[in-house]
Structure formats: C-alpha cells, structure tokens
Curated annotation (Swiss-Prot):
<dbReference type="Pfam" id="PF10239">
    <property type="entry name" value="DUF2465"/>
</dbReference>
<dbReference type="InterPro" id="IPR018797">
    <property type="entry name" value="FAM98"/>
</dbReference>
<dbReference type="GO" id="GO:0072669">
    <property type="term" value="C:tRNA-splicing ligase complex"/>
</dbReference>
<feature type="region of interest" description="Disordered">
    <location>
        <begin position="313"/>
        <end position="349"/>
    </location>
</feature>
<comment type="similarity">
    <text>Belongs to the FAM98 family.</text>
</comment>
<protein>
    <recommendedName>
        <fullName>Protein FAM98C</fullName>
    </recommendedName>
</protein>
C-alpha cells in the first residue's frame, strides 16, 4: 500500500515538473518503460533540449540525435543503449538506471518515473543556468580570478583528501569518480564517530520567508564584522607605523616594509563566511566552552604566553604628576605700578 502511494506521489511530482517545463503530462504507459513509444518519445524530447542548451559534454555532429525513439523491432535496444550513454554523461546518481541491463531496470516499478524525474531536474537546472547567463549584466571574471578560484578549490580538495587519508588523484580523474571515492570513505568512517556528531546545526526546512530572514541576518552580521575588522586593521596600521619613528627604523625601513606589506595586503575587512557555512555547520558548533577551561587552554597555550615584557620607558601623563600651568606673561604698565612713599629708616652704624 505504501509503495502504491509513493509511486502515485512520484507520478504527480513528475507531471508537475513536465507541465512547468512546457511538456505534456506523464504518459499513461510510463510504467511500461522503454517498450512504450510515447515514453521513448518524451525522453527523446527532453534529451534533445538538453543537447540544444549545451548540457552535454560530448560533441555530436550537426543533426545527430541524442536519443532515438524509433518504431522498428530494434528500436528499444537502440534506445536503451543510447540512454545508458546519456545517463553516464549526465552523471546520473541512480546506479540501477546506469547499469548494464537497462531494460530490466526500467521494467521495475517506478523506474520510468525516476528516469523522467532525473531528466526534468537536469533540464530545469540547465534552463536556470542559461537564464542566469542572459540576465546577469556583470562582466565575466578575467582569467586570473578564475585561476585563483580554481586554485582555492584544489587546495580545499587536497585538505579533504589528507584528512580522509586518501592519496591525491591522478591527473584527468573524473570528478564523479573522485566524489564516489570520497562518499565511500566518509561512509566507512561515519560509524566510528560518536552518535549525533553529524547532526546539522540548522535542522529545520527553509522556505522562502526563512531564506529571506537568514539572508538578512547574514548581511547584518557581515556589516557588523566589517565595521569591527576595519577598526582593528586601523589600529594595526597605527601600531606598525609607530615602529618607524625610532632612529634604528630609518635604516631598516625597507626591510620592515618588505615583511609587513605582504601580510597587510592579505588582511581585508570583508568576511568570507557565507550561508553555505551555516548550512554545513554541525550542532556541536553551538556548544559554549569557557575560554579559560583546561581543555581549551591545552589547545591555545603557546610559548609566547610565558614571555615577559622588558622595562619600557615611562610615558607619564598621570593626573597626580601634572604641574600647575605657567602664568601668562604680561607686559609692564607705563605708570610703573604701585609705589611705596614711606620714610626710610636709617641704618645703624
């Protein structure tokens, strides 16, 4: 009973996707799989639009069909052979559909609907990407920025492989194969983790209002972070500039700038934390640990904590050390000021 309900729900979802894409509803013989000409024709139309929009990597001759429906005796075999190649090219995650015996897989209950659902999702994503490229007025990034971004992705991938203990893949390894190896390794290590260690921090489903609220909160935090970081960077600039006031710094000024400028250029006020980090965060991130606890200090203490500052010159400026102000200077008056005209006493001899 539950399987029938699930298949009915899947059929309704596929019908809704097809209507949104501008195609007709699900053919009545979708359960018959590749043996149904209407089912093959619908798959052919979906694959043809994918090829037109440039979603396929393999180059084909002009006028060549990605899938052929056909009506002859060998039409079903040709369709299944071409379908297997198409699904592998699109990196379909459904192993049953990409296997060798495609005819038997499509005869299983719900297999035809799964195939249509996958093709519809690929077509929806391709249309969105094409629409984004048409509506985005911003210019394409230059080659240098793309190379830097690609280098960052490669660095993240290297760190992931090192953390999992996997060797670096050989040049030319397909991304799908690498992701499968990562998935297999993570699935192997997951049972050894404590229970609940992979629980997401954000467990509720996000609808449109929640997405807007999350984006607004993220923007507010980024603005506040930028304001605070600008203040810290300004204090850093003032502190480093104070080192150039001494007599010794005049001779070592170029060497000091050669060390400080590359480090300072990396420090930007913008934050690199995005909503993707929030979605990838785990529940243990919300645990508040005292910064002075023994476990935390074991990981944060370093040798510089034991270094004592030497004697530094006293800059003064204390209120109790301030001297009274100097009286203002006044010129002499013309009358010579007050005079005393009394009788003077004679000095004794």
């Amino acid at each position: 009973m539950e399987a029938v309900k699930a298949e009915a729900w899947e059929g309704a979802a596929v019908a809704q996707d097809l209507l949104a894409l501008g195609y007709g509803g699900v053919p009545g013989a979708a359960s018959r799989g590749a043996s149904c000409p209407d089912f093959r024709g619908l798959c052919v139309r979906l694959a043809a639009e994918l090829a037109t929009l440039g979603a396929l990597e393999q180059q084909r001759e002009a006028g060549a069909e990605v899938l052929s429906a056909g009506d002859g005796p060998g039409a079903e075999e040709d369709f299944l052979r071409q379908l297997g190649s198409l699904l592998r090219e699109l990196h379909c995650p459904d192993r049953a559909l990409c296997g060798g015996d495609g005819a038997a897989a499509l005869r299983e209950p719900g297999a035809g609907l799964r195939l249509l659902r996958f093709l519809c999702s690929e077509l929806q994503a391709t249309r969105l990407l094409c629409l984004r490229s048409l509506l985005d007025p911003s210019p394409r990034p230059p080659l240098g920025e793309g190379v830097v971004e690609g280098a960052g992705m490669v660095q993240e991938l290297d760190l992931t492989l090192q953390a999992l203990g996997l060797p670096r893949p050989a040049p030319g390894t397909p991304a799908s194969q690498l992701l499968q190896e990562l998935h297999a390794k993570i699935s192997e290590l997951q049972p050894s983790l404590p229970p609940g260690s992979l629980q997401p921090l954000l467990s509720c489903s996000l609808d449109a209002p929640r997405w807007e609220a999350l984006e607004s909160l993220s923007q507010s935090l980024r603005d506040q972070y930028r304001c605070r970081r600008c203040l810290l960077l300004k204090r850093l600039d003032l502190t480093t500039s104070a080192f150039h006031w001494s007599d010794r710094a005049e001779a070592q000024g170029e060497a000091m700038r050669a060390v400080l400028i590359p480090i300072r250029e990396v420090l930007t006020p913008e934050s690199d934390i995005s909503i993707a980090h929030v979605l990838a965060a785990r529940a243990d991130l919300s645990c508040l640990v005292p910064a002075t606890s023994v476990a935390v200090r074991r990981g944060t203490c370093c040798a510089i904590n034991k270094v004592l500052m030497g004697n530094v010159p006293d800059r003064g400026g204390r209120p109790n050390e301030l001297e009274p102000p100097m009286p203002t200077w006044r010129s002499r008056r013309e009358d010579g000021g007050p005079q005393c005209w009394g009788r003077k006493k004679k000095k004794k001899k």
